[in-house]
Amino acid sequence: MARVLVSSPSSFFGSPLIKPSSSLRHSGVGGGGTAQFLPYRSNNNKLFTTSTTVRFSLNEIPPFHGLDSSVDIGAIFTRAESLLYTIADAAVVGADSVVTTDSSAVQKSGGWFGFISDAMELVLKILKDGLSAVHVPYAYGFAIILLTIIVKAATYPLTKQQVESTLAMQNLQPKIKAIQQRYAGNQERIQLETSRLYKQAGVNPLAGCLPTLATIPVWIGLYQALSNVANEGLFTEGFFWIPSLGGPTSIAARQSGSGISWLFPFVDGHPPLGWYDTVAYLVLPVLLIASQYVSMEIMKPPQTDDPAQKNTLLVFKFLPLMIGYFALSVPSGLSIYWLTNNVLSTAQQVYLRKLGGAKPNMDENASKIISAGRAKRSIAQPDDAGERFRQLKEQEKRSKKNKAVAKDTVELVEESQSESEEGSDDEEEEAREGALASSTTSKPLPEVGQRRSKRSKRKRTV
């Protein structure tokens, strides 16, 4: 007879519930089972261990004499197995949480940003209670979305400041490239001129980093608040098509390296949770990956020949896949937060960058610097390849025209010089003949060779 053994792993702290990563396996005929030693803490803070073995054997079930043969026993046990996994999904317990035997109080993870996470958790519960009071369905799911919107609105001024600083740096890039080309090889001079340019334009290169650093504790606190709520087992309700906000896995399972055990290995050709629940849980990671790619396509910077930028864009292409993989190993409540935050971030960036919501944070005296840099960039790097081809053709035509004009000018100068030289040769010949005719002495005249003109010398040298 077949039996079903359910045993809790050693990382589970004193809870009688089953973790999502608990093993559910079928073995051969016979009884017996496996026991795991489970640590827990008593009231005096001493660590004890206890063993737990859950055995379900068909040998212990009496025969069914009065049942009809049409009853599907396999379907009954399949439903029981699904129920066990549903209970396991609800029992999301953090790896660093300790459950005492008396009060069952959960120790929350906080760290440096514990006060922020406590405040976020309090606001989340208030939002959930308020939505439940007005009979809004899926109260916890909508509470997560509302809390994300509130935090995003609170950090909007910092985001705007960061975008304005980034736009100012982008406007100065043509001038910075001109400095790098002018002082190529002299790194010290490049740094000096660049810092002088920043000072003249009133731009601080570090101004774009400070708002981002300021928002990091807020988002870490929100993440920890959602993790604490999941660890407390409060994400038991579903959200539209999602069976449970605490499923399909837990924070503890992710930290132990078994965050995707709900997907693999397959049991009898189907995933452990069944096809319906598995597909329902996979919708959020797929939506998260799709939203990441849409955001990257909308905010994609203009293409350049910079190899560093090409390598960065290549890395960013695989980033959504990594985020989707992380979404497989956390509760669905955190995936809803990630998806909402990504959609809101994309909307903010489109408004600030594309629709003119943010203006470059620069002094008015920097307008001439920016216009000069843009003019150089437009001349040196035309945006369209066809425009560059037309410029080259026009330049070639102008060069040919200049050569033709220069050639005509040279020919005219040569003709005028040849005419003046021929006139001077005729006058010299007449003077020589007159001198010979007027000579009355018998003294022989010296032989005078034929005199070559300057034009003949010029032709010979050419």
From Swiss-Prot:
Q: What Pfam families does this protein's entry cite?
A: 60KD_IMP (PF02096)
Q: Which residues lie on this side of the membrane: Lumenal?
A: 57-130, 227-232, 300-317
Q: GO CC annotations?
A: chloroplast; chloroplast thylakoid; chloroplast thylakoid membrane; peroxisome; protein-containing complex
* Region (Interaction with CAO/cpSRP43) residue spans: 314-318, 374-388
Annotated region (Disordered), positions in chain: 393-462
Q: Does the keyword Plastid apply?
A: yes
Which GO molecular function terms does the record list?
A: membrane insertase activity; protein domain specific binding
In terms of superkingdom, the source organism counts as Eukaryota
Family per UniProt? Belongs to the OXA1/ALB3/YidC (TC 2.A.9.2) family.
Subunit comment for this entry? Homodimer. Forms a complex with CPFTSY and the signal recognition particle (cpSRP). Interacts (via C-terminus) with CAO/cpSRP43 (via chromodomains 2 and 3) and with LHCP. Interacts with PAM68, SECE1 and SCY1. Interacts with TERC. Interacts with ALB4. Interacts with STIC2.
UniProt remark on domains: The C-terminus (339-462) is required for interaction with cpSRP.
| Name of the molecule in the record | Inner membrane protein ALBINO3, chloroplastic
